From Swiss-Prot:
It is found in: Secreted, Extracellular space. This is Echinometrin. Pro-inflammatory agent which mediates the degranulation of mast cells thus evoking an inflammatory response. In vivo, when injected into rats, diminishes the pain threshold. Induces dose-dependent paw edema in mice. GO terms for cellular component: extracellular region. Its main location: secreted. Detected in the coelomic fluid. Keywords: Mast cell degranulation, Secreted. Disulfide bonds: none annotated. The keyword Secreted applies. May be produced from vitellogenin or creatine kinase by limited proteolysis. Does not induce hemolysis in human erythrocytes and has no antibacterial properties.
Length: 8
């Protein structure tokens, strides 16, 4: 779930 990490 790297996409969620983008939020960071």
């Amino acid at each position: 779930l790297r996409k969620l990490m983008l939020q960071r």
